[in-house]
Amino acid sequence: MDNSPPPPSNESPPPQPPPPQATHTGSPTDFLKGVVGKRVIVRLTSGVDYRGLLSCLDGYMNIALEQTEEHVNGVVTNRYGDAFIRGNNVLYISAAEPI
């Protein structure tokens, strides 16, 4: 019996499945309600990130964070016990850990 490998085929390998994408179907309001009390990243329009526990927010996107770290270009530049961010400066809010 011949144990040599089969000859190469001219067929290309099957395509890889696409990477998994977020499958959250809830509304932005549902997301924001779900991250209250959890660690979040708040990106400002200036490019500065604030990371901390989302204490509360209002309809204007005014945000209160606890145990807050300020990140500029990925480097921690300040730490605050509490931070209050005016909503018109907020570019986005993301969960710092899977929800």
UniProtKB/Swiss-Prot annotation:
One GO biological process this protein is involved in is:
tRNA processing
Q: Which GO terms describe its cellular component?
A: nucleolus; P-body; sno(s)RNA-containing ribonucleoprotein complex; spliceosomal complex; U4/U6 x U5 tri-snRNP complex; U6 snRNP
Disordered as annotated region, ranges: 1-30
Intracellular or extracellular location(s)? Cytoplasm; Nucleus
Q: Which residues form the Sm domain?
A: 27-99
Q: Which CDD domains match?
A: LSm6
Q: Does the keyword Cytoplasm apply?
A: yes
Any idea which UniProt keywords this protein has?
Cytoplasm, mRNA processing, mRNA splicing, Nucleus, Ribonucleoprotein, RNA-binding, rRNA processing, Spliceosome, tRNA processing
Coiled-coil stretches, from where to where? none
Biased composition regions of type Pro residues, renumbered to the chain = 1-21
**Database matches in SUPFAM superfamilies:** Sm-like ribonucleoproteins
Chief localization: cytoplasm
Q: Sorted alphabetically, which InterPro entries does this protein's record hold?
A: Lsm6/sSmF, LSM_dom_sf, Sm, Sm_dom_euk/arc
Q: What domain of life does the native source organism fall in?
A: Eukaryota
GO terms assigned for molecular function:
RNA binding
Identify its protein family: Belongs to the snRNP Sm proteins family. SmF/LSm6 subfamily.
Q: What does this protein do?
A: Component of LSm protein complexes, which are involved in RNA processing and may function in a chaperone-like manner, facilitating the efficient association of RNA processing factors with their substrates. Component of the cytoplasmic LSM1-LSM7 complex, which is thought to be involved in mRNA degradation by activating the decapping step in the 5'-to-3' mRNA decay pathway. Component of the nuclear LSM2-LSM8 complex, which is involved in splicing of nuclear mRNAs.
- Matching PANTHER family: SMALL NUCLEAR RIBONUCLEOPROTEIN F SNRNP-F, U6 SNRNA-ASSOCIATED SM-LIKE PROTEIN LSM6
Q: Could you give the subunit structure recorded for this chain?
A: Component of the heptameric LSM1-LSM7 complex, which consists of LSM1, LSM2, LSM3, LSM4, LSM5, LSM6 and LSM7. Component of the heptameric LSM2-LSM8 complex, which consists of LSM2, LSM3, LSM4, LSM5, LSM6, LSM7 and LSM8. The LSm subunits form a seven-membered ring structure with a doughnut shape.
Q: What is this protein called?
A: U6 snRNA-associated Sm-like protein LSm6
Give the classification, highest ranks: Eukaryota, Fungi, Dikarya, Basidiomycota, Agaricomycotina
